[in-house]
UniProtKB/Swiss-Prot annotation:
Belongs to the MQO family. Keywords: FAD, Flavoprotein, Oxidoreductase, Tricarboxylic acid cycle. It catalyses: (S)-malate + a quinone = a quinol + oxaloacetate. This is Probable malate:quinone oxidoreductase. One of its GO terms (molecular function) is L-malate dehydrogenase (quinone) activity. HAMAP family: MQO. Pfam families: Mqo (PF06039). Its EC number is 1.1.5.4. Its cofactor is FAD. Pathway: Carbohydrate metabolism; tricarboxylic acid cycle; oxaloacetate from (S)-malate (quinone route): step 1/1. GO terms for biological process: tricarboxylic acid cycle.
Length: 498
């Protein structure tokens, strides 16, 4: 599909329109620009800069989710068996992202120093039951090449050498354990988004409009959508053959406006967040890792505590949290009516059902919102016993909108991400949250392959994507040898030496 197939050949028509200026839309834009450089497409973003909402450095967890240390990705089933399928899938998806970055960096198209730093990922637990779980996890995961470099320790001194703030002022007789993977990362997805869009903007067929909001969209015939957009109070209409909705929490509202049948069963459950942040150099210099703990039994996935080394605006910080909370807004810079406007006659019963089933979760989120500063620091002390309230301040994190989906039993609350596609491939929407940004490349490859943009030349275009991400290799051959080769190649390009 090329811009020469523009049915109207005017400035109001685009082959594709991407709604949202965050990591998802920018990743898709990058892929389109690289493998379909001749198509004419538009990116619209409500705010005045890219990556300012969910992708923002303080709004995104930024871990470089590779399932190295996130214990909620390796749950126990009813029989006590450890399930690592999700961890393997996330790790492979993250390596796909790493592979694309390596290819672009090697070609001189992006600067990895602006968004990527290598830093160890650590899982930390205390108590015999949790230690047994962590050891079982270590044994199971190191059977796979993705996690072969993981270390396990119950030595107080060794764990102190890995993360000294975790053991400072902790009783040495306490039963503790940790795993460590040296090849962890800290990713600034806001900076990465800007790198992507800077590259994409070099393509003369691409237009990026900031301070531009989607108001409404409607399918006007079998091949076209009409979008009403507003820019600084001025409303205009544009047409396109393909729409991608990647506007974070607001995507659910836009998806509902599309009126595609596939949208009818969805709703959204908004969750806010807050960080404790430390800038004191004598502390930031002592902690050089991302440390994940284990959530309390029965608590939701967003309650998993982690103490992260982060680099934001060229400054090294410590972030602890995020502390979840409840709000009716779908974005930080949007309306408190977002949740209410998303309630429709075809999802109201599933949303009410989720509310009744998850009353404990709602109470938990409200209680988290009401915590005092000292109470939050007490939580931090479980991981960092020497924490002093005066060293930390509170900052709002981003909004997440978890997926509510209609089921035979009423409604189900889903944690994760999900792609919604129209049956004809003319519209795609991304819903959900974690692991999100870290797996953006794999997700956007899937979006692109199912879109009308790939309709006429799918085989050739899939090969182009493969060659972009995995030069001289075939992604379909993802065996242990392939995984080892790709990691070795990426390490070499990035200059990482295990």
């Amino acid at each position: 599909m090329t811009s020469s197939k523009n049915p109207t050949n005017d400035n109001s028509y685009f082959d594709a329109v991407l709604v949202g200026g965050g990591i998802m839309s920018s990743t898709l834009a990058l892929l389109i620009s690289e493998v379909l450089p001749d198509i004419k497409f538009l990116i619209i973003e409500k705010l005045n800069a890219p990556g300012s909402e969910s992708t923002g450095a303080f709004n995104n967890a930024g871990t470089g989710h590779a399932a190295n240390c996130e214990l909620n990705y390796t749950p126990l089933d009813e029989k006590g068996n450890l399930k690592i399928d999700k961890a393997l899938s996330i790790n492979r998806s993250f390596e796909t992202s790493m592979s694309l970055w390596a290819s672009l960096y090697e070609a001189g198209k992006i600067d990895i120093k602006k968004f990527l730093k290598f830093i160890p990922h650590i899982s930390f637990v205390s108590g015999q039951d949790n230690i047994s779980f962590l050891k079982k996890r270590f044994q199971k995961m190191t059977e796979n090449p993705e996690f072969i470099d993981m270390e396990f320790s119950t030595s107080f001194d060794e764990i102190s050498s890995w993360a000294p703030l975790i053991t400072k002022d902790r009783n040495p007789s306490t039963q503790i354990a940790a795993t460590r993977i040296g090849r962890g990362t800290d990713i600034n997805f806001e900076a990465l988004t800007k790198e992507y869009l800077s590259l994409v903007s070099l393509n003369k067929n691409v237009e990026i409009r900031y301070k531009t909001e989607l108001i409404d969209l409607m399918k006007i015939d079998k091949k076209q959508w009409e979008l009403e957009i507003s820019s600084e109070g001025r409303k205009t209409s544009i047409r396109t053959g393909y729409v991608f909705l990647g506007a974070g929490g607001k995507t659910i509202n836009y998806l509902q406006k599309s009126k595609i049948p596939e949208a009818k069963s969805y709703g959204g459950f908004p969750v806010s967040g807050k960080w404790l942040i430390c800038e004191k150099k004598d502390l930031t210099e002592k902690h050089n890792s991302k440390v994940y703990g284990k959530a309390d039994i029965g608590s939701p996935p967003m309650s998993v505590p982690h103490l992260d080394t982060r680099w934001i605006d060229n400054k090294k910080l410590l972030l602890y949290g995020p502390f979840a909370g409840f709000t009716t807004k779908f974005l930080k810079q949007s309306s408190y009516f977002d949740l209410f406007s998303s309630i429709k006659k075809n999802n109201i019963f599933s949303m009410l059902d989720v509310g009744f089933k998850n009353n404990d979760l709602i109470n938990y989120l409200i209680s988290q919102s009401l915590k005092s500063h000292n109470s939050r620091v007490e939580n931090l002390k479980n991981m960092m016993p020497s924490a002093n309230p005066s060293d930390w301040y509170l900052k709002n994190a981003g909004q997440r909108v978890q997926i509510i989906k209609k089921t035979e039993g009423g409604g189900s609350l889903k944690f994760g991400t999900e792609i919604v596609n129209s049956s004809d491939g003319s519209l795609s929407a991304l819903l959900g949250a974690s692991p999100g940004a870290s797996t953006a490349v794999s997700i956007m490859v899937e979006v692109l392959e199912k879109s009308v943009l790939f309709l006429n030349d799918k085989h050739n275009l899939k090969k182009k994507i493969n060659d972009l991400i995995y030069p001289e290799r075939t992604a379909s051959q993802k065996n242990s040898t392939f995984i080892k080769e790709i990691k070795k190649r990426n390490n070499s390009i990035f200059g990482f030496h295990p």
